[in-house]
Amino acid sequence: MKRREFVQTASFAAVGLLSLPSFLAAGKGQKGLGLQLYTLRDTIGKDPKGVLQKVASFGYKELETYSYNNGQIFGLEFAEFCKYVKGLGMNVTSGHYGLNMIKGDTWQKAVDDAKKNGQEFMVVPYINEPERKSIDDYKKICADLNKAGEVCNKSGIRFGYHNHAFEFDKLDDQIPFDVMLKELEHKNVGMEMDIFWVVNAGYDPLKYFAQYPGRFEQWHIKDMDKEDKNRNANVGTGAIDFKPIFAAAKKSGMKRWYVEQETYPGQPIDSAEACAKYLKTIL
């Protein structure tokens, strides 16, 4: 995972809301703290059940996974993993899937597995550099994402795309992220905004919520080190003020959010705990 810049004015008409899949329009609310398990990538593959026990003890209730592959995750059957998560009082509500997975039978199987285990969102989190050399490259990817979203819609799952920084580096005097917002059909693809990377690029998430209301259905929450903007801080100790951001959740369209740390001031598991403690004080 990596990231960077954008801005543009757009309106989100009421007719657009009416065209959304009913499962999204209904909008089940988040039931507790969320965590993207990539935060614990150094340990979860070695001891998934032990790590999940600690995560549950911190008060997390909703999890976003990564690394699913052909019915397996972290060395376990995906169904077994989800059952264990539920036994700890948590749920897998979202997952990250590689761009190379969204075509063909592998995608349908992933969607079927997600559906069977009660997952609500499936997200593509990254575009490899060789695949994004031009605006035309982005447009082609958006076409693929729209098709993947159609498959998800048929199973009652919401499909999304997660931003990094590179989408905001201009190509041909255009900002790729703006292009994506135009090319992606909202009925098929929602956005998972990584708050950190928007701020890292020098932009204000609140402005994007105002310019594209209803488009940012999931968030990643991580704070920015006050001395080095490319490093994470435990949420609540860095440069980002999350109170006004959460206050704008309805305008943004947010349904789910997840703490995600890519770098740490200490041990990853300690960061997961510290972030949970802070977020409990403001939510």
Question: Which stretches of residues belong to each language-model region?
Answer:
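Active-site acidic/histidine proton-transfer and metal-coordination neighborhood
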Residues: 10-11, 17, 21, 62, ...
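Active-site beta-loop-alpha junctions enriched in small/polar residues
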Residues: 38-40, 66-70, 97-100, 127-129, ...
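Active-site mouth loops of central-metabolism enzymes
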Residues: 34-46, 96-103, 135
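Histidine-acidic metal/acid-base catalytic patches
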Residues: 4-16, 22-34, 40-58, 172-193, ...
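Mature catalytic domains of secreted/periplasmic carbohydrate-active enzymes
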Residues: 62-64, 75-76, 82-84, 94, ...
